Amino acid sequence: MKSRLFIISQYLLPHHLLSRLAGCVAECRARWFKNAFTAWFAKRYQVNMSEALVEDLSAYEHFNAFFTRALKPGARPLDETPGAILCPADGAVSQLGPIEHGRIFQAKGHGYSALELLGGDPALAAPFMGGEFATIYLSPKDYHRVHMPLAGTLREMVYVPGRLFSVNQTTAENVPELFARNERVVCLFDTERGPMAVVLVGAMIVASIETVWAGLVTPPKRELKTFRYDEASRAPIHLEKGAELGRFKLGSTAIVLFGPEQVKWAESLGAGSAVRMGEMLAVPAQA
């Protein structure tokens, strides 16, 4: 009954209004408020500040600065296995596996369209049909920067407007097409394993999504917008394996997609597996 009421509330609540209000709270610089709220949050979610570059909670100018905190050098060593594809973020594996008939598995019989996830462009989605996906959920206590699984050159970024349902196990099991309905940013790279998509999915009270090349990704009008980076007039944007790609200001989910016969997921991973950025996520499926 409790879960059902929660799901009903997800359809009734004003997602974007609540998220804008949360964004204002998270950017508040009043010392008495930001210090008290940050301390409460760190204690409530048992945030490990010993690995943070700045351990003093009161040193952060606002809550968002704390939430997107940098880590000390070496806190997330990169797996050195030759050809390893790295986990892009701290969190837990929600699901991973093949993209079958253009569908990505969500939970308990729910799936969603890879085409819709990527913004509805058949040409952009085509290389991933029959490929592989991995969905990583970032919890409140996690490090909320997203990094490159492989070295890649940015080809395209797509902002896809949408709802802002909460993202957790309950909504994954009860909200159809959850990740293809929520607001998201699709980042498409060319890599040694072919096209790679990293999708940053928003959620309720996720105030914003940033990338290292574009900053805050919030078009003036909430409509689908494509940014191309492979034009001759632009200097190429190349990111090395393990380099920061973007960050969540109040996190959510990162989804990584590869084409067919390109990667094989690490045998130790499955739904529910705890992961850290820089650990092995997959290996090449072929030499």
UniProtKB/Swiss-Prot annotation:
Coiled-coil residues: none
Record-annotated active site: 90 (charge relay system), 147 (charge relay system), 252 (charge relay system), 252 (schiff-base intermediate with substrate)
Cofactor requirements of the protein: pyruvate
Enzyme class: lyase
Catalytic activity of the protein: a 1,2-diacyl-sn-glycero-3-phospho-L-serine + H(+) = a 1,2-diacyl-sn-glycero-3-phosphoethanolamine + CO2
Pfam family, one: PS_Dcarbxylase
Location(s) in or outside the cell: Cell membrane
Cofactor note: Binds 1 pyruvoyl group covalently per subunit.
Pathway per the UniProt entry: Phospholipid metabolism; phosphatidylethanolamine biosynthesis; phosphatidylethanolamine from CDP-diacylglycerol: step 2/2
Main location class: membrane
Residue(s) at site: Cleavage (non-hydrolytic): 251-252
PTM per Swiss-Prot/TrEMBL: Is synthesized initially as an inactive proenzyme. Formation of the active enzyme involves a self-maturation process in which the active site pyruvoyl group is generated from an internal serine residue via an autocatalytic post-translational modification. Two non-identical subunits are generated from the proenzyme in this reaction, and the pyruvate is formed at the N-terminus of the alpha chain, which is derived from the carboxyl end of the proenzyme.
EC number: 4.1.1.65
Membrane topology listed for this record: Peripheral membrane protein
Cellular component, GO annotation: plasma membrane
Bridged cysteine pairs (disulfide): none
Pyruvic acid (Ser) modified-residue sites: 252
Gene Ontology biological process terms, A to Z: phosphatidylethanolamine biosynthetic process
Function according to Swiss-Prot or TrEMBL: Catalyzes the formation of phosphatidylethanolamine (PtdEtn) from phosphatidylserine (PtdSer).
Subunit structure: Heterodimer of a large membrane-associated beta subunit and a small pyruvoyl-containing alpha subunit.
Name recorded for this polypeptide: Phosphatidylserine decarboxylase proenzyme
Lineage of the species this protein comes from: Bacteria, Pseudomonadati, Pseudomonadota, Gammaproteobacteria, Pseudomonadales
Gene: psd
